[in-house]
Amino acid sequence: MRTWVEIDKENLKYNILKLKELADNREVLGVVKANAYGLGSVEIAKILQEVGVNFFGLANLEEAIELQEAGINANFLILGASFEDELVEATKRGIHTAISSMQQLKFLVENNLNPNIHLKFDTGMTRLGFEVDEAEEVINFCKTNNLNLVGIFTHLSDSDGNTIDTKNFTLEQIEKFKNIVKGLDLKYIHISNSAGIT
């Protein structure tokens, strides 16, 4: 027995337009990491561009380069951790990069690199990201060193849960994130995933 998935292009476009509507027509970051979860990142990115998605989230530099080389003309954000050589290459290619440690920030400063950076904060996923209580220090470091801080984000770890505990945890994450970004004027402040919109 074989298993396969068929994607209806028109349904996908309709779903994206509905998500945009639910999100007050804010810009959508189309996450197409891991080959668009096995569906084909180039193909899915092209479909998403047909409905105005021009910013794509990827796991690593290699995935972003694949889309660039396939002729996808858009912004790209590496959501995962980047090694130092990847930070250099991302800067050369104009790829936005998630930054989740002071070590990465110091490397950028020491090597006179200034890519578009998005600070990732850990509000409960417990994987990558700055701790919430580091926010002021990290943001001040970026400002003091004239780093090109264009975004701040976190990940809702349990937004698809349907228990009182998971809903409360998601609300706690949102409150932590609101405290981090309060008073900041950045182009990209992103927290939500598909489940988090509803």
Residue spans for each PLM region:
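Active-site loop/helix belt of alpha/beta enzymes
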Residues: 37-39, 46, 91, 110-115, ...
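A charged N-terminal "starter" segment
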Residues: 1-96
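Conserved, mostly hydrophobic/aromatic
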Residues: 12, 33, 67, 101, ...
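Short aromatic/basic micro-patch
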Residues: 6, 118, 129
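Membrane-helix boundary/helix-loop-helix interface segments in multi-pass membrane proteins
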Residues: 100, 107-108
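Non-cysteine beta-strand/loop elements that form the S-adenosyl-L-methionine
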Residues: 56-59, 77-83, 100, 115-123, ...
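A polyampholytic, Gly/Pro-enriched intrinsically disordered region
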Residues: 99-102, 176
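Short, well-ordered alpha-helical microsegments
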Residues: 64-65, 84-87, 105-106, 135, ...
